[in-house]
């Protein structure tokens, strides 16, 4: 975890409360996990600016701003009463909820048809087909692309293609967040002996869904003796 982000994180009242709890209860592994997730999220989110420069706020500043807002949104007396799992999940869901805005490079190349046929495995073929169906819904833009290519205005045509890809990434990012969490963090989001990976993925997915999705969530996850994670609470705050 870089020094700048460490300083920013330490300013968050939510993190301060988590850190206080973990130090008091000798749960340093929880803080270490937050550090690992922070490094992963911040490094990965840098590619958002690379691929979609208009989304400049999906970075560590955006994460810090969200944690600051959450710290103001939750009254101090309520914050003091939150369980350690609640605090932990609030922080890591903020870190990872937009991770789907940063797809693996191979998917972007597949959507742009910039891979050789030999490079397309079953997953990439499926992704290319899903994007192709999505692209067809942008009727006017596709017509403009074809016209510009006929006029040999290739750079202008590519700008429109990039716009459609950006919209696809944005509209599917919560699904992708769940997939990325499953791929890179399966079995690693653990508090005490409780695996919270699936709960984290569900919470991150929920932030882009209708509020009615929250009604389908489990209410609590037992995380140890007299310790519980309130899943809908974290999901509501994240929204």
PLM region spans:
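C-terminal effector/catalytic modules and regulatory tails appended to multi-domain proteins
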Residues: 1-38, 225-231, 239
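Catalytic phosphate-handling regions of large nucleic-acid enzymes and associated NTPases
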Residues: 2, 47-50, 58, 101, ...
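Phosphate/oxyanion-binding active-site loops and adjacent basic polyanion-contact surfaces
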Residues: 55-69, 169-177
């Amino acid at each position: 975890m870089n020094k700048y982000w460490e300083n920013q994180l330490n300013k968050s009242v939510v993190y301060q409360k988590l850190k206080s709890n973990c130090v008091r209860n000798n749960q340093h592994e929880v803080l270490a996990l937050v550090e690992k997730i922070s490094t992963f999220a911040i490094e990965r989110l840098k590619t958002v600016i690379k691929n979609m420069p208009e989304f400049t706020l999906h970075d560590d500043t955006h994460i810090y701003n969200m944690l600051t807002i959450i710290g103001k949104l939750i009254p101090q007396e309520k914050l003091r009463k939150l369980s350690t799992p609640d605090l932990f999940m609030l922080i890591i869901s903020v870190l990872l909820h937009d991770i789907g805005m940063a797809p693996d490079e191979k998917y972007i190349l597949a959507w742009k048809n910039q891979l050789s046929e030999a490079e397309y495995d079953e997953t990439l073929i499926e992704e290319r087909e899903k994007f192709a169906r999505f692209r067809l819904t942008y009727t006017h833009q596709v017509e403009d692309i074809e016209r510009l290519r006929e006029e040999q205005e290739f750079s202008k045509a590519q700008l429109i293609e990039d716009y459609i890809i950006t919209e696809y990434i944005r509209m599917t990012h919560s699904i992708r967040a769940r997939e990325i969490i499953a791929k890179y963090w399966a079995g690693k989001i653990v508090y005490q002996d409780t695996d919270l990976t699936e709960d984290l993925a569900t919470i991150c997915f929920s932030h882009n869904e209708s509020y009615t999705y929250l009604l389908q969530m489990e209410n609590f996850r037992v995380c140890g003796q007299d310790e519980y994670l309130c899943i809908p609470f974290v999901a509501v705050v994240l929204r």
